Structures are given as C-alpha cells and as structure tokens.
From Swiss-Prot:
Expressed in pancreatic islets, within both beta cells and non-beta cells (at protein level). Highly expressed in adult testis; expressed in all types of spermatogonia. Also expressed in the prostate of neonatal mice. It comes from Mus musculus (Mouse). It is found in: Cytoplasm; Nucleus. Pathway: Protein modification; protein ubiquitination. This is Protein fem-1 homolog B. The gene is Fem1b. It comes from the Eukaryota.
Length: 627
C-alpha cells in the first residue's frame, strides 16, 4: 500500500487529476482514507496529497480531493518556502504562501480554518503578506482572517509586509486597523523593518498613520536603523518629518556616513565624507553652543586613531581613504556601542579587504577586535574562529609569518567558545540541538586547525608554553563529538573534515605533529569513543600506509610511547591489531607490542570469564574492563 501511496502523492504533486482518480477508483473507503492521509517525505518536506497539490497550485486536484473524497482541510505537514522550513503548515497556508488564489478560494469555501497557525504561529494571512499577494490578503481578511495574530516572535503581518516592501498590502492592513506601533520580541515596529529595508513609500505610509518613533531592544530608533543600513533617502525623510533633538539628528548623519565607509553592498567613500561633514557642520552651527563629541579612547585595532573633533580635522583626511575607513569604524562603535550586534560586521568586512590586499597584520588586528566584541556580547563566534584558521593558513601557504601570540589569542577565544557551546548543547531545546551541535563540532575542528597551524609557526619557548596552556585547558574540558570522539581521536582520523578555503592547503588529518602536541599537553591516550575505540583503534585503519607511511608510523609510536594499550578491546571485543586494515599498520603495531604482566593478567581474567567486579580495587576493575 505504501508503494501505491507514493503514486497517489506523485499524481497530486504533478496535477494529474485523471491519473489520481484512476488510482483511487474502486478502492475501499478505508484504503482511500489511508492513501489520502498518507504523509510522504521528500527533500526534508512532509506532506499529504492535498498539501502538495495546494502548494503546487493544482486547483483541479484540490477540487477532486475536497468535493469527491471529502479530505480534511486541516491536514498539516512540513514544507520549504524561500529557504525556510515551515512545520505545521496546512494546505491553505501553502496555497496562500505560494500565491495560488483559486486554490485559496476552494479551500476557504470548503471550511479551511483561515486562522490556523503553524508551529511558529504563522497564519495563511501572514504567508500571503510575505508573498505580497494583495488579492489573497483581501480575500482572507474578508473571510475573517485575524490581522492581529503575530508569529512566535510577535512579528505581525504588517511588519512582514513592511519588511518585504509590499506597499499596497501595508496600506490595506493599515486601513483595516492594523496597529502600526505593535512591537516584535526584539522591540522593533513595522517602521523599523521598513526603514532597515529602505522602503521609503512604506515609511511614508506608516508616518501618515502616525507610527511612533521608538527604540527597539538594541536601543535603535527607525532613524538609526536606516542610517546603520545606509538607507540615505529614508534617513533624510525621517529627519524632515520626525521630531528629533539636535544630538539625535547629528548622530544619524554621522552613523549614515560611517556606515557607507565599510559596507560591502553600499560602499561609497564620497557619501562617507559628505554625511560626516554635514554632521560636523551641525555640531558647530551655533558658535555659542558647540556640541562636542564624546570620543572613545584610542583602540589598537583602529591604528590608535582619535576620531575627528572639528571640521578642520575632518577636512585633513578627506583624500585619505584608509583614514576615512577607520573613522567610520570608530564612529559606529561610539554611536552604536561596543555591545551592539551590528558593530562587528563592518569591522570584519574591512579586515577581509585588508586580507585580499595581503595586508594581513591589519586584517588580524581588526578581526581580533571583532572577535572580542562578539564574545563580550555572548554571540556565537564559530564563523569568526574559522575565519582566523583560514587567514592563518593562507599566510603560511604564502610564506607570510604568523605571530604566535595571535594564534594563542585565538586559541584562548576558541576554548571559551567551545566551553559556551558545550553548555548551549546541554541546555537547548530538542528542536535546536542539531544546529547547536553542528556549531559546537565546527568549533572543535577549528581548534584542531589552529593547533595544526601552531606546529608550522616559529614560536619562542614562552609562546609555546602559552599555546600549550590553551590546549591543556580544552583537553581538561574533554569535549566530545556526537560519535564520542575526543580531540585525540579527531587528530588521528582521516575522516576529520578540513575546511576547503585555504585551510586544506596547510592542515590535514591524521596529523602526527598535532597528535604529539595533544599528548604532550595531557590528552588521555586510552580515551574511547562511543564504540569503545581508542585513538590506536582509529589510526590502524588509515588507508594510506605507503604514501603517508611517516604519519602512520609517527602516530603509532607516539601513542604507544604515551601508554596506549595495544591489547585494549572495543565494544566488539576487537583490539587495535584486530582492527588493522593493512599489513603495514599490522607490522608497525606488532613491533611496538610490549605486553606487560598486568595486561596479560587482565586478559586472562576476561578470557576465562572470572568474576572480578567488587573483588578488586575500582581502578583495577576499569583496567580489566577494557581488556
């Protein structure tokens, strides 16, 4: 029956109404109920024939299912829309989101609940507002759709229409008494969303309906949001309409100019100077009441520059692009505050430009500053850390010197991030645990890349001690992957993933130097994964024993010298020798096998099924157990 259900689903998906009818012809009522309620899984989506037909706009199929087979309109599934995964979506939600008006009318006329919500509390009306379909929006509202239902983030239909730039939908919702001053969880209103996206007609419409100028949860007004996003026309409109004080007006102009200096999509150094100069003139407009800047202390990442405090100082750097770039970063940090989530992005962008121009020292200064800001704000930094591994690898590949203190600094931040991500994984909801675990494992791999890079860097004895301390600190936390792999397991495993943007030019696994360094810093040589495998069990399965003989040989020697038990058994009762996949690893292992009397005794106890639990000291129980 499952095979038939697949054909039924395919016919519904492709709009083949006659094929669908033929497949269901002369079937019993229970069979039909099963076939039309069967949830098919495809590409991460879970849907019934009705849901997929509605999603794809097949009105004839939908009509057949509703009128002839009386399929329930409230079936729910999981669908993908514009890169988003929507759980708990009905056929009506799908039809509204995909813009299939005829299907929407069919479903509503057959009793579909216009206010049914998905798992994230999204309604069919919200889906239509996202897509900008005014005809569907009007129809749903006329059929009692509630315009005030917000999603789980308290984001309303008006907000999503404002953000997506659907002016006609925004106007209609306002006419239907949608609240222009409703706030999302983040404290933002529809005016914030429209201003950020630069939809000036919607900003005008919202102002006409007396939308209030309020701060969001990050202390940002719509004016500041527009300035930070380089939306100059919106800034100028709000300055002409909004009743803002002199300081707010000046800071909006400064923030706008500063943002143009370091924005990938909107970079314009002429506008940077223009708006910074306008703001400076406003500061000095009234000679009796000059509004002085509260400048930040010099910051190393910004070349220890001090922000321009008068028109003459600003004019002096007019032709100096680099100085204007730094001025922009300083101004943004002063106005937005170091803890603002948006402060770090332009710093990272400017650092990337330096890296592209082979000015690595400047790049690293800026990225370290951004990393510290993000960690101070308790932001997820797995991408930032990986970025360092990439640029350090690029430098080594180009024979550029990497400074050991920089590696140590990033390793220290990496340990902190891994510790925080371990706590996130423990305390997160089941729905988000997969993503959190991905980030956490990514951080472990990045840490190993950084350790690998450190082995290829000139270090003083003091620098090496500092690096080793960070490695020790992480080993002490004993982080594990989903498979139970320790750092040592990952270091000896050819399946450990290596990032392919510069990093794989320098880093590879298994890695003898990384293995030795981890062992020197206290890694437990006999630690086991979820299958009971030690690092020795893993390395003897390496499938390049000839071409990479030195790596295989060095790692086996290092592990054995560090106390690896060559007779240790995993959960399948296999020793490393049993797990060897090549003659080379087998020979290498046999030459290192020096069986102690203690190991022989432990194996004899296990081989003869002698009861040893609670008969010998606890430490010896564990020792006998892994033999």
């Amino acid at each position: 029956m499952e095979g038939l259900a697949g054909y039924v689903y395919k016919a519904a998906s492709e709009g083949k109404v006659l094929t669908l009818a033929a497949l269901l012809l002369n079937r019993s009522e229970s069979d039909i109920r099963y076939l039309l309620g069967y949830v098919s899984q495809q590409g991460g989506q879970r849907s019934t024939p009705l849901i997929i037909a509605a999603r794809n706009g097949h009105a004839k199929v939908v009509r057949l299912l509703l009128e002839h087979y009386r399929v329930q309109t409230q079936q729910t599934g999981t669908v993908r829309f514009d890169g988003y995964v929507i759980d708990g979506a009905t056929a009506l939600w799908c039809a509204a989101g995909a813009g299939h008006f005829e299907v929407v009318k069919l479903l509503v006329s057959h009793g579909a609940n216009v206010n049914h919500t998905t798992v994230t509390n999204s309604t069919p009306l919200r889906a239509a507002c996202f897509d900008g379909r005014l005809d569907i929006v009007k129809y749903l509202v006329e059929n009692n759709a509630n315009i005030s239902i917000a999603n789980k983030y308290d984001n309303t239909c008006l907000m999503i229409a404002a953000y997506k730039g659907h002016t006609d939908v925004v106007r209609y919702l306002l006419e239907q008494r949608a609240d222009p001053n409703a706030k999302a969880h983040c404290g933002a209103t529809a005016l914030h969303f429209a201003a950020e996206a630069g939809h000036i007609d919607i900003v005008k419409e919202l102002i006409k309906w007396r939308a209030a100028i309020v701060v969001n949860g990050h202390g940002m007004t719509p004016l500041k949001v527009a300035a930070e996003s380089c939306k100059a026309d919106v800034v100028e409109l709000l300055l002409s309409h909004a009743d803002c004080d002199r300081r707010s007006r000046i800071e909006a102009l400064e923030l706008l100019g500063a943002s143009f200096a370091n924005d990938r999509e909107n970079y314009d150094i002429m506008k940077t100077y223009h708006y910074l100069y306008l703001a400076m003139l406003e500061r000095f407009q009234d000679g009796d009441n000059i509004l002085e800047k509260e400048v930040l202390p010099p910051i190393h990442a910004y070349g220890n520059r001090t922000e321009c405090r008068n028109p003459q100082e600003l004019e002096a750097i007019r032709q100096d692009r680099d100085a204007l770039h730094m001025e922009g970063l300083i101004v943004r940090e002063r106005i937005l505050g170091a803890d603002n989530i948006d402060v770090s992005h332009p710093i990272i962008y400017r650092g990337a430009v330096y890296a592209d121009n082979m000015e690595f020292e400047q790049c690293i200064k800026l990225w370290l500053h951004a990393l510290h800001l993000r960690q101070k704000g308790n932001r997820n930094t797995h991408k930032d850390l990986l970025r360092f591994a990439q640029v350090f690898s690029q430098m080594i590949h180009l024979n550029e010197a990497v400074k050991a203190p920089d590696i140590e600094c990033v390793l220290r931040c990496s340990v902190l991030e891994i510790e925080q991500s371990m706590n996130r994984v423990k305390n997160i909801s089941d729905a988000d645990v997969h993503s959190a675990m991905d980030n956490y494992e990514c951080n472990l791999y990045t840490f190993l890349y950084l350790v690998c890079i450190s082995t290829k860097t000139q270090c003083s004895e003091e620098d090496q001690c500092r690096i080793n301390k960070q490695i020790y600190n992480l080993i002490h936390l004993d982080p594990r992957t989903r498979e139970g792999f320790s750092l040592l397991h990952l270091a000896v495993n050819s399946n450990t993933p290596v990032d392919d943007f510069h990093t794989n030019d320098v880093c590879s696994f298994p890695n003898a130097l990384v293995t030795k360094l981890l062992l020197d810093c206290g890694a437990e040589v006999n630690a086991v994964d979820n299958e009971g495998n030690s690092a020795l069990h893993i390395i003897v399965q390496y499938n390049r024993p000839i071409s990479d003989f030195l790596t295989l040989h060095s790692i086996i020697i290092s592990l054995v010298e560090a106390g690896a038990h060559t007779d240790m058994t995993n959960k399948q009762n296999k020793t490393p020798l049993d797990k060897s996949t090549t003659g080379v690893s087998e020979i290498l292992l046999k030459t290192q096998m020096k069986m102690s009397l203690k190991c022989l005794a432990a194996r004899a106890v296990r081989a003869n099924d002698i009861n040893y639990q609670d008969q010998i000291p606890r430490t010896l129980e564990e020792f006998v157990g892994f033999h």
